Amino acid sequence: TNSHGIFSLNYGARLSYWSWNKEWLFSPRVSLGIIPSFNEDFTFRIATGLYYQAPFYKELRDTVTTGVSTKVRLNRNIKSQRSFQVVLGGDYKFKLMNRPFKFTTEVYYKALSNLIPYNVDNVKIVYYGGNIASGYTTGIDFKIFGEFVEGTDSWISFSLMKAQQKVDGKSFPQATDQRYNLNFFFSDFFPGTTRWKMTLKASIAD
């Protein structure tokens, strides 16, 4: 805390070892939060870190088809999928109809490497069994949260996103790619009592 505001710094790291492929993983992360002295209704955040996701069994399987025969082996040279992430965000607290509300915005970028791509065929998912792809995920999120009805919380969120991957020099959307997502959660009490509550959820995405 100083004349410029309140600062909050959090940092840490995780060290792990995977015996299957004898892989050591070091995952540092750090975040900084600031409540400026000129207006304590604002909060600003920045966070970054390096994250890993170890493969599960289906991602280890490397399938090779020769003629009419198919061989499956478990890839001992496979690596954990890696994501370097940066997030910038902010909150603004305000009053509306004399009730508390909060508006939140976050912008993020994730640089992805050592990806294990997969194909989706109806309900069947087939993994390539190797770290042959890279990519990125980026987007911006907006959310307004508060008491649209006094005494109970509701919120509306809207996200713009893009997720791409590159395999053999060719770029295309990831299977999880969405361009927008609108979510709505509303709660209200039954007339004359606060013991009974009704909630309504809706989501639109593409």
Where are these regions (language model features)?
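Signature of Gram-negative outer-membrane beta-barrel scaffolds
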Residues: T1-D41, T65
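Residue-level signature of outer-membrane beta-barrel architecture
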Residues: N2, L15, I34-P36, L50, ...
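Transmembrane beta-barrel strands of outer-membrane/channel proteins
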Residues: Y11-L15, L32, I46-L50, G90, ...
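Membrane-embedded beta-barrel scaffold of Gram-negative outer-membrane proteins
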Residues: S37, N77-Y136
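Outer-membrane beta-barrel translocator/channel fold
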Residues: S37, D41-K95, A205-D206
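Gram-negative outer-membrane beta-barrel transporters
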Residues: N2-S3, F7, Y108-A111, G130-D206
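Transmembrane beta-barrel architecture of outer-membrane proteins
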Residues: T1, L25-R29, T43, R73, ...
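Outer-membrane beta-barrel translocator domains and adjoining extracellular loop/strand segments
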Residues: N21-S27, Y57-T63, L115-V123, M161-P173
